[in-house]
Amino acid sequence: MKKFLKNWFTDNRKAGLMRWWLAGMCYFMIGFGTQVGGYSSPIDFIFFLGVGIGLVTIVVYNPIAYNVFRLTRNGEILNHTYRNISGAKKAARNLVEIAASMITVILVYLTYQNLNLLLNQMLELPVETVLIPGEPFGFATLYLLFYTVLSELAAKLRDRKKKKESKE
């Protein structure tokens, strides 16, 4: 059992668990700890939550994950690419990280919205009724799911572009 757990908890899974925890922490701090969480307009909340998670990813997650864990994708170690980027590429990567966080938060918000609308229609409740409110555990789980899917899609597109360039 001990060997199974040691083999199952790979560095990628540990980093994923850390990303899950940070997303839930950001949701808790911004959603419940600031006035943005109480606004009637979800656009403000989505914006600040996306920017907040993006900044926490840049300042907290990336330095820890890429310096403590040995992250791999398709057998390739990703730590070297993170450490060897400097200057304008690093700034562009940070902006892409914030944009990716905002897009992911939008997808999570739309998931909550559509689930609530579906349940309201099924149970014949008023549209304003919120049956599944946002909370840190559910938000972090959906955030990690969508972030993983988006990052895998981006990696496949990058690989496809590299293969196309190498053929030419």
Locate the predicted segments by residue.
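Cytosolic juxtamembrane helix at the C-terminal end of the final transmembrane segment
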Residues: Y66-G75, L144-E168
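Membrane-helix boundary/interface segments in integral membrane proteins
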Residues: I64-L95
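Alpha-helical hydrophobic membrane-insertion segments
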Residues: L5, L49-N62, A91, L95-V108, ...
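N-terminal first transmembrane alpha-helix
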Residues: M1-E76, I132-F137
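Alpha-helical transmembrane segments and their membrane-interface junctions
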Residues: M29-G33, A100-L125
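Loop-to-transmembrane boundary segments
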Residues: F9-W20, R83-I106
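Hydrophobic alpha-helical transmembrane segments and immediately flanking/interface helices
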Residues: D44, F48, Q113-Y143
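Short hydrophobic helices that act as membrane-entry/anchoring signals
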Residues: K2-D11, A15, F69, R93, ...
